Amino acid sequence: MTVGISAGELRESTEEELITKLRESKEELFNLRFQMATGQLANNRRLRAVRQEIARIYTVMRERELGLAAGPDSEDSK
């Protein structure tokens, strides 16, 4: 799973990679919440970390949508 992804690393990723990481993080969050409900979760801190990773991914995607940050594809064409 995704562990400790920085915003800089995400900005270097392509759109497809971001979508894949988002899907993996959401899946991990679902599993962590399920473990929490059944009392099997050992590391509560991981819930917050995964939520923050999801927020970072959404932020990078939104920056690109608004044109505030360019993806790795547009930098090659300059």
From Swiss-Prot:
Keywords per UniProt: Ribonucleoprotein, Ribosomal protein
UniProt keyword Ribonucleoprotein present: yes
InterPro entries: Ribosomal_protein_uL29, Ribosomal_uL29, Ribosomal_uL29_CS, Ribosomal_uL29_sf
Superkingdom assignment: Bacteria
GO cellular component terms, semicolon-separated: cytosolic large ribosomal subunit
GO biological process per UniProt: translation
CDD domains in the cross-refs: Ribosomal_L29_HIP (cd00427)
GO molecular function, one term: structural constituent of ribosome
Cited Pfam families: Ribosomal_L29
Entry similarity comment: Belongs to the universal ribosomal protein uL29 family.
Listed name of the protein: Large ribosomal subunit protein uL29
Record organism: Mycobacteroides abscessus (strain ATCC 19977 / DSM 44196 / CCUG 20993 / CIP 104536 / JCM 13569 / NCTC 13031 / TMC 1543 / L948) (Mycobacterium abscessus)
